[in-house]
Every structure is written in C-alpha cells, then in structure tokens.
Amino acid sequence: PRVRSFIAHQSGITSVIRRSPDIAHRMVRSLSVSSQRNKSVAHHEDVYSHNLPPMDEKEMALYKLYRPERVTPKKRSAELLKEPRLNKGMGFSLYERQYLGLHGLLPPAFMTQEQQAYRVITKLREQPNDLARYIQLDGLQDRNEKLFYRVVCDHVKELMPIVYTPTVGLACQNFGYIYRKPKGLYITINDNSVSKIYQILSNWHEEDVRAIVVTDGERILGLGDLGAYGIGIPVGKLALYVALGGVQPKWCLPVLLDVGTNNMDLLNDPFYIGLRHKRVRGKDYDTLLDNFMKACTKKYGQKTLIQFEDFANPNAFRLLDKYQDKYTMFNDDIQGTASVIVAGLLTCTRVTKKLVSQEKYLFFGAGAASTGIAEMIVHQMQNEGISKEEACNRIYLMDIDGLVTKNRKEMNPRHVQFAKDMPETTSILEVIRAARPGALIGASTVRGAFNEEVIRAMAEINERPIIFALSNPTSKAECTAEEAYTFTNGAALYASGSPFPNFELNGHTYKPGQGNNAYIFPGVALGTILFQIRHVDNDLFLLAAKKVASCVTEDSLKVGRVYPQLKEIREISIQIAVEMAKYCYKNGTANLYPQPEDLEKYVRAQVYNTEYEELINATYDWPEQDMRHGFPVPVVRHDSMDG
C-alpha cells in the first residue's frame, strides 16, 4: 500500500504541475520530508532490536508483542529539550527539529549518538579527578538520559567506579557542595503518616514506579553516618539497575528517609542539607518505616520492588526479617553481598577441586554483610548434602571483640549458631592456626588487617588460599591485590570489594576480580520486576550466584579473575532474570500472566535500549474508500447564480 500510495502521489504531482506550480512544489517537498521520515523510522526499527539475534517472522512478531510501545511526546520546543528522557541534543534529525519545534534552538550541527558519546568520554578523561568526573556525568544524566546510559554501558569498567563505589562515597561526603538538581524523594521523620508519605510519593513525576531503593543514610558504604547526604547511594544504585540490568529509568525511584544524623561534623556543617538533630530511634523510627512501606504499596501496588540499602547493622537484619514475607523487598547489603561472594566461592571450587561444604571459612568482621554471607554459605552447604549444624561448624566469625565463642555473655542472636567452643582470642593468626580455614573473608573496614604474616599463614595451610578483602572503599580494604599475590607467590584466589589494578609477578599478569554486588542485584531486580515475583528469598539469590559463577571463563581463571568481566554484566543480568522466571513459574511464585511464550525474548524485549529512538510515530495508510467524503459535492454553475 505504501508503494501504491507513493506512485499515486507521483502521478498527482505530474498532473498538478501544469495547473499550479506552487502546489506541485509543496507536494514535492512533502514527499521529500516523508522519505526522510521513513528512513528514520526504518533506522529506528533496526536499533530497536539491536541486542537480539537474527529472528524469523514468528520470533519477530513475538518480540514486537513484548516490547514497550513508544508514543509521540506531547512536549514541544524548549520544554522538550528540558526533558532528559527525550532530549537528544544535536542528535535530533532535521525532520524532528522542524516537526517538534526545535529548529533554531539547537546549533546547526547534526551528530550521531556515537559522536556524542565520544565527545563525552573525551571530556571526562580530561577532568582532574574522579569527583569532577562524577559531577560531569551527573550533569549529563540531567540533560540527556539515553546518552548518559550509552556512555556508561560502553565504558562500564572505566565508569562504574565513578557512578558507584568508590567515587559515590566521596560524592556523598561532599553532597552539600556538589548538589545541583533533585534526583529522588526526601521523606523525613516529620512526615510520619501514611497519608503524608503518600502525598510526597505523589509529587514524583513518574506514576509507573516499579523499583524503589531506600536508605536512611546511617551506614553509607564504609563511611558511616552521612544522613541526608546518603541520597547519592539510591541514585547510584538505580543508575546501575538501568545500565547493568536494563531496568527502565521511568520505573526507578530513589528515596532518602531523613531521621536526623549522629554525625557531629555534618550537624555543624553550614552546607548540610538534612535535618539538624540527632537520629530518631525506637517506636517513632519503626512507625516511619511501617508507614513508608504501606504508602509505597498503596501508591504503586504490592508488586513494587523495595530495596533496602546501607541501613546500620542493628536495623538491617531486623527490617529484612520484618518485611521480607510481607512485601516485595530485599536488602542488597545482606542478600546481594552474600550472593556475589558465594558466586566467587563457587568459582574457586573449580580451582581448589573442593566443594563449598568441604572448606572452612574465617570471617574477619561480623556485621550484616559477613553474617549474611555466612548464612548463604550454610544454605549452599545444605544443598550439597550436609546438615545445618555441620555447615555452621565450618564457619568462624571474628568481630571487634575477637572470635565469637560460646563463652560470651552477650551475643548477636544470629551469631549463636556460629559460636565456637574455643578459647577467646583477638588474634587472626591464632584462629587461622587453630581452625585451618581454606578461605579468609574480610568485611571489617580495617585497612591492613590481613598483613604479611596473616597472608603467609593462609598460604602455609592451603595450596590455593582464598582471600577476599571486601571492605569499601579501597582505603579500607583488609589487604591489596598486590599484597595477596606477593605474599602467596601468586597462589591466592583473591577478590576485593572495590577495584584494584592489574598486578604483574614473576612474569605473570594477575587481574583481580571485584566481588561487586552489581553482578547480582541488577539481574535480581530485573527478574523480580518483569515477572512480578512477590517474595525475593535466598533461593533466588543462590540461583543468581550459580549463574554468575557459570559465566567465568577458563581464560579468566588463568589470570586470577574469579568473577566475569564487567562488560558482561548486562548479559548476565538478562540470564539471571530468565533463570528466575523459570524457577518462579515452576514454583508458582511468578505473578505475570499469561506466562510469556518465550521467557528470554520477553526479557530482551523489555530491557532499556540506550540507542536513540524516533520520537515521532510512523505514519500509515488507510484504505482509500475510507478516506472519501460521504456524499458528492453538487456542481453549481456560475451562470445560475446570476440575478
């Protein structure tokens, strides 16, 4: 029909030229613009499925059924340029500029997204430090959302430390100085009712919120209580949801619960942007959390995922236990960290030739992260066939008071199962020599805790000692990659919480892996959101861990990397989401109905596309008979009108 319409249009121009050259000229110009428009649409159709393998007609029909539909924006002119979700800058075509009222508002240059991305990364590399790069990327996200995610996705290894740890910690510490534009919601202890919180949620500019990341700012990374400055963590976390998981940005909402801060430096800082009083605790705090959860589900529905982030240890497990079976929620510091560390340990089994249940594990630091990892290891050991009691006996915890033993008068209830009938000691060396662990895991934020003597002791009792120094940022890591490899003569299976550079020893290059939660939480979030999984339990996180471990290649193992390359995370996230869907549909815990015919195609069709899209919907033809007038126009003779 489009070809026939084109031929008819050409014939019409020919017949009109003799009668009215002006009308013919306008028709030719219209045809030219239409041609440009159709080329643009064709390009859009190509890039829309850029991450898919070749498909037959049936598969393409499925893909088009599953993918989100686009709608021509209602905004025009300068208002459209202010909308980061739609703005392309100099990436707008001439047709778009003219049709959307942008012509003349932009420089008369036309750039592809590739050219724009190159321009951005070049300028980023010229910045004097990582905080300056963070600020520049933050500004780009405020102006051009797709370009921001395109740059991050294209340079994920280089920019993930800028977008998230460790630079996000520095950004949070200086948030009062670098604050430019609001990116999330602030809910305070003064807003402590369901109706008040609901009103605040209603002020958010998106209605279709499916993922919320919330913090109270009390334990930001390894930096402690940063109060309202902690908003940078939910913002950064959700940026990784999009860049690494393909979650749609419009589904994401960062939230800071401001109940005050006990950080006196912030309370005395004239630039501090939060409530200026000590933290509220107890009943009022718990009521705020209850009201927040109720308001979120009232506003957005029970299916909305709520991720808890950087809550202090006394609250982290307590709130997880309280809400896990009532809401769609998880705590990434506990479950995400545990999952990614178990993934690293599963990878190590390919080198040590031992099952997870055949090793012993010594944790230095017994906070929420370590306890969560220990419990996830127990879960995996039970899957391998040993009892919970036997599994707990293979795990040793050390905290600020030393080894967790049965002699303690006061103990965290979750530590009781790991308490040992051994002499009390604060020496890591003594515990290593007594317990003879195969893995040493640090989550203490004590720089240098794994000194030369400790590392060499691990090498003496293990052919391939597992040493994970997980504390963030790098300045608080228990040991560096260089120290671990040097003091074990290259035998260590090492991973860290923040990235360390490659290291060469005895002519061999080691590329240390980073036990980053980003291998886990984007995929878990994607699967939970797309398939409306009601409860995110440890079975799903263990499933994700196994998928991550299976993606580590033999070439990676040869250079000491126990995690996949960072550039593979987005594909891993898609695979995690697919595995979650299979598991949850089998167990009746997925609530998206009807079940998609092809789960993987459904996921791939739903993930966020960082390529520019045509903003103006394609035109199409109707049957000619449906466009005719309903009656013939009578011919009126001029002479009949004479008086």
From Swiss-Prot:
Cofactor annotation remark: Divalent metal cations. Prefers magnesium or manganese.
UniProt GO BP: malate metabolic process
Gene3D superfamilies, alphabetized: Malic enzyme, N-terminal domain, NAD(P)-binding Rossmann-like Domain
Pfam family, one: Malic_M
Residues that, per the record, bind (S)-malate: 219, 472, 516
Organelle transit peptide: 1-38
Annotated positions binding a divalent metal cation: 309-310, 333
Compartmental location: Mitochondrion matrix
UniProt entry keywords in alphabetical sequence: Allosteric enzyme, Metal-binding, Mitochondrion, NAD, Oxidoreductase, Transit peptide
Residues of the active site: 164 (proton donor), 237 (proton acceptor)
Catalytic activity entry: (S)-malate + NAD(+) = pyruvate + CO2 + NADH; oxaloacetate + H(+) = pyruvate + CO2
Alphabetical list of NCBIfam families matching this protein: PRK13529.1
Misc note: This isoenzyme can also use NADP(+) but is more effective with NAD(+).
SUBUNIT field: Homotetramer.
Protein name: NAD-dependent malic enzyme, mitochondrial
